[in-house]
Amino acid sequence: MKKIDIKILDKRIGDVFPLPTYTTSGSAGLDLRVCTQAPQHLSPGETRLLPTGLAVHIADPHLAAMILPRSGLGHKNGIVLGNLVGLIDSDYQGELMLSVWNRSQIDFLINPGDRLAQMVFVPVVQVELNIVSEFTSSQRGSGGFGHSGRQ
């Protein structure tokens, strides 16, 4: 198993709030909690940047992290990430922040310690671009949106 350095910036993590964990043995994402000092009221349509109290240094250029919304919050409450998906590069060392967007029509209360997002580590392949004047033909060619059908 690959180990990633994580720095706890908020002393409540591991004491008042649990350390990030995988909820089940089959979970792909580590739950991320909001580490604010007070509850946050998010009005309809409002976005806000909230701290997680954690910094991460992946260090391996063949890995990145993606910050993804928790599905229940978006479906049931209209609370999603303002940037939809956050990409954490391997050389970033700052605090993980969550851009939270209330796309519902009612106020939403976020309490300190609430799980609002999840972090998934993914492989990265950096490519070298090869400039060509033509592509080798393929069966699909340049067929785009809907070209391959629905069935």
From Swiss-Prot:
Does Ribosomal protein count among this protein's keywords? no
The residue range of the signal peptide is none
Q: Does the keyword Acyltransferase apply?
A: no
Give the catalytic activity: dUTP + H2O = dUMP + diphosphate + H(+)
Output one GO MF annotation.
dUTP diphosphatase activity
**Per its UniProt record, what Pfam families does this chain match?**
dUTPase
Residue runs in coiled coils:
none
Which of this chain's residues are annotated to bind substrate?
A: R70, S71, G72, N83, L87, I88, D89, M97
Q: Name one GO biological process term.
A: dUTP catabolic process
Per its Swiss-Prot or TrEMBL entry, what cofactor is needed?
A: Mg(2+)
> Top EC class per UniProt?
hydrolase
Q: Which domain of life is it from?
A: Bacteria
Q: Which Enzyme Commission number(s) are listed? A: 3.6.1.23
Keyword terms, alphabetized:
Hydrolase, Magnesium, Metal-binding, Nucleotide metabolism
Q: Which InterPro entries match?
A: dUTPase, dUTPase-like, dUTPase-like_sf, dUTPase_trimeric
Database matches in CDD domains: trimeric_dUTPase (cd07557)
Say which family it is in.
Belongs to the dUTPase family.
As for what it does, the entry says: This enzyme is involved in nucleotide metabolism: it produces dUMP, the immediate precursor of thymidine nucleotides and it decreases the intracellular concentration of dUTP so that uracil cannot be incorporated into DNA.
Name the chain's protein.
Deoxyuridine 5'-triphosphate nucleotidohydrolase
Q: Which organism is it from?
A: Hamiltonella defensa subsp. Acyrthosiphon pisum (strain 5AT)
Which gene underlies this protein?
A: dut
